[in-house]
């Protein structure tokens, strides 16, 4: 078995959020990049992923794209979103994932484990696609309220961030 360290130097970790509500045209669907994160991936002799451990710094989440809003996001909007995510949503607490089981499937693996964020640890399962060149990609849907996170809302609740967001991982494993 070999152990590989991955992080921003080998790929991306992003969070996709979506807006809803009668005033959703005033908000934006966001692509938020996690700038500081690291993961340890254990790979078996056959090249199959055996385990995954990931840690992310909640203060390093930065909005990279805002789609479908009535107007472009301003620098103040971006700063306010960053502050809200770090202080109100995640409480400045580290984000971590530790696999408990990895099961093979066509074109990849299903990873089961424990996701910790905002003071809460819960089971999480997602599929990872693995290409022949070592590219690893997966999306984990997360229902914020299951981690005791209250989705953002404004304008007396007429603009909200949808309760389910997506954590998207896309990395290149080395050919070792």
Indicate where each model-derived feature is located.
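Low-complexity, acidic/polar, glycine-enriched regions of mature
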Residues: 1-176
């Amino acid at each position: 078995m070999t152990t590989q360290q991955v992080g921003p130097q080998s790929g991306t970790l992003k969070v996709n959020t979506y807006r809803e509500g009668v005033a959703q045209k005033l908000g934006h669907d966001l692509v938020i990049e996690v700038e500081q994160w690291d993961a340890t991936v254990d790979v078996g002799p056959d090249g199959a992923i055996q385990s995954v451990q990931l840690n992310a710094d909640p203060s390093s989440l930065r909005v990279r794209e805002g789609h479908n809003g009535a107007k472009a996001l301003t620098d103040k909007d971006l700063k306010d979103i960053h502050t809200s995510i770090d202080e109100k949503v995640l409480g400045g607490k580290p984000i971590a994932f530790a696999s408990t089981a990895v099961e093979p499937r066509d074109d990849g693996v299903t990873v089961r484990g424990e996701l910790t964020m905002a003071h809460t640890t819960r089971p999480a399962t997602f599929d990872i696609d693995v290409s022949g060149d070592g590219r690893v990609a997966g999306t984990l849907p997360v229902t914020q309220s299951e981690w005791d996170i209250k989705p953002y809302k404004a304008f007396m609740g007429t603009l909200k961030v949808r309760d389910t967001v997506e954590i998207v991982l896309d990395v290149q494993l080395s050919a070792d």
